[in-house]
Regions:
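Bacterial N-terminal signal peptides that target proteins for export
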Residues: 1-6
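C-terminal motif of bacterial Sec signal peptides marking the signal peptidase cleavage site
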Residues: 14-17
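Bacterial signal peptide processing site
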Residues: 19-22
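Basic- and aromatic-lined ligand-binding clefts that recognize polyanionic substrates
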Residues: 28-46, 142-194
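A short, structured surface patch at a secondary-structure boundary
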Residues: 34-88, 92-97
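His/Asp/Glu-enriched short active-site or ligand-binding loop at hydrolase and phosphoryl-transfer sites
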Residues: 59, 183-206
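Extracytoplasmic ligand-binding site segments that recognize negatively charged/polar headgroups
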Residues: 119-132, 166-186, 230-233
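Structured C-terminal subdomain patch of bacterial secreted/periplasmic proteins
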Residues: 126-136, 145-146, 159, 226-282
């Protein structure tokens, strides 16, 4: 079970699991529609479009804006439990296509609940398309225009690093679970948008961290999620990992972190996330 949950979490961080096309189902939306949202990015779009009051429940990654933290939680979007969702008596379930297998989809349809399933591409274009698809489907297109405009405005404020520092992303859940991000991940895309470059190019997705790989990559900066940094005991704990002190990042104590949902969701706050990352790596 531990391996399954880890694999699920890393799959969310991989670009390879996503597609560029968007697919929608008629949402049949009304002011009284009760929605269960199964993605942090989707929930942010709904809230930004003025539909927060319609959200009856969310997955555990939906914690922004603050009001969503008190919404009933139905588990992780990579391990969807139909019974828990149906107990909230939703009219509409919105999620990512990759999280729904045919049996699960059939279960919701048999229960008479409408589904709106979309693909998500972790890019600037993909973020805008996600906003457009959701707001058009829910008949709040003007709100979508505003959200897309905000994304553009915030991205325009980014002051990318001029020297393209080598950034190594470490995904950690305590000292026993430490993975390093290779190519083809959404964090790599974020690093690139912020003006940096991925320190690891030899492999795709995520692999266990080794001292040899660390020294070879020799990153200028080590990046973690806030939760990952905390799980390792802060910067001091990261510095104790074998190989860290031999890197430029370790020697110069360049260990940074960001909120995982902000950095990795590629929702309406994408521009804000890239601004923050650019400031940290510059």
């Amino acid at each position: 079970m531990k391996f399954t949950l880890l694999a699920a979490s890393l799959a969310v961080l991989s670009l390879g699991a996503c597609h560029t096309n968007q697919e929608t189902t008629s949402a049949g939306f009304a002011d009284s529609t009760k929605i269960v949202s199964l993605s942090g990015a989707i929930s942010e779009v709904l809230a930004g479009a003025g539909l927060e009051k319609n959200i009856a429940g969310t997955d555990i990654t939906s914690n922004y804006p603050e009001a969503l933290k008190v919404k009933p939680k139905v588990g992780h979007n990579r391990n969807i439990n139909a019974e828990g969702i149906l107990a909230l008596r939703p009219d509409l379930i919105i999620g990512l296509k990759k999280d729904f297998n045919p049996a699960l989809t059939a279960q919701f349809k048999t229960a008479g609940v409408k589904l709106l399933l979309v693909d998500q591409e972790y890019s600037v274009k993909g973020t805008k398309q996600l906003i457009r698809t959701l707001t058009d489907s829910l008949h709040v297109s003007a709100k979508g225009d505003s959200l897309i405009s905000i994304v553009d405005t915030e991205l325009a404020k980014v002051k990318p690093a001029t020297h393209k520092p080598k950034v190594l992303f470490i995904y950690a859940r305590g000292a026993g679970t430490i993975m390093v991000g290779g190519t083809g991940t959404q964090v790599e895309t974020a690093i690139s948008l912020a003006g940096g470059q991925n320190a690891v190019t030899e492999f795709a997705d995520y692999k266990p961290l080794t001292a040899e790989a660390l020294v070879k990559a020799n990153p200028d900066i080590i990046l973690l999620f806030d939760s990952g940094l905390q799980s390792l005991g802060g910067p001091e704990g990261v510095a104790k990992i074998q190989g860290i002190k031999e890197t430029n990042a370790g020697k110069n104590k360049k260990i940074i972190s960001m909120d995982g949902e902000l950095l990795g969701s590629f929702g309406p706050r994408l521009g804000i996330a890239i601004q923050e990352l650019a400031a940290k790596i510059n």
